[in-house]
Design a protein with these regions (language model features):
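Extracellular glycosylation-rich, acidic/polar low-complexity regions of adhesion-
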Residues: 1-178
Length: 178
């Protein structure tokens, strides 16, 4: 797994578009409501493998997500947009983001606990996006775990084999003041 520094602004995911459809840092909900999660800060996480038969997938866990923050990610199996918010006490809520309407998430590919999100069948094309806590700037030090899951079929039954490839790999998210 390869990770790199990510950089963005404190209002990432919370700003709106102007009348011409352009990002405008001056248009935002003062209460910190997430209005444009797709404008979050992309996390620079890439997983690779030498396995070329298509039987291998990756499970990525992002840790140390701050209270009041959020992660926006595309669900790998359905393509639905998922918004995971973390309350001030760290309690996560997973919802489907349907053009601003929050719906219940009933899938199992994305799970969350206090300060963490786990994404099964991780997709490099759609990296998760970090939304910092409202009005927060500075550096956020997240950690990434990754494992490969290789599935073979034996006597008609799928048999998964897991191999941890990274534990607590640091990823710094620099959040600039606006």
């Amino acid at each position: 797994v390869k990770v790199g520094q990510s950089i963005g602004y404190e209002d990432a995911g919370r700003t709106s578009l102007d009348k011409d459809g352009k990002y405008d840092k001056n248009i935002q909900d003062k209460d910190g409501t997430i209005t444009n999660p797709e404008k979050g800060i992309p996390l620079n996480i890439k997983v690779t493998s030498t396995d070329k038969d298509g039987s291998e997938t990756f499970t990525v866990t992002i840790k140390d997500i701050p209270n009041g923050g959020a992660i926006f990610v595309k669900e790998p199996l359905t393509g639905k947009d998922i918004l995971v918010t973390y309350a001030e006490d760290g309690t996560p809520t997973i919802k489907v983001w349907n053009n601003g309407i929050l719906e219940d998430y009933t899938g199992t590919t994305i799970t969350a606990n206090k300060g963490t999100i786990t994404i099964e069948k991780y997709d490099n094309v759609n990296p998760p996006k970090f939304i910092p806590p409202h009005n927060s700037h500075g550096d956020f030090d997240l950690k990434v775990d990754a494992k490969t899951v290789d599935t073979v079929v034996i006597d008609g039954d799928p048999v998964p084999s897991e191999n941890t490839t990274a534990i607590d790999k640091p990823i710094k998210v620099v959040v600039k003041d606006v």
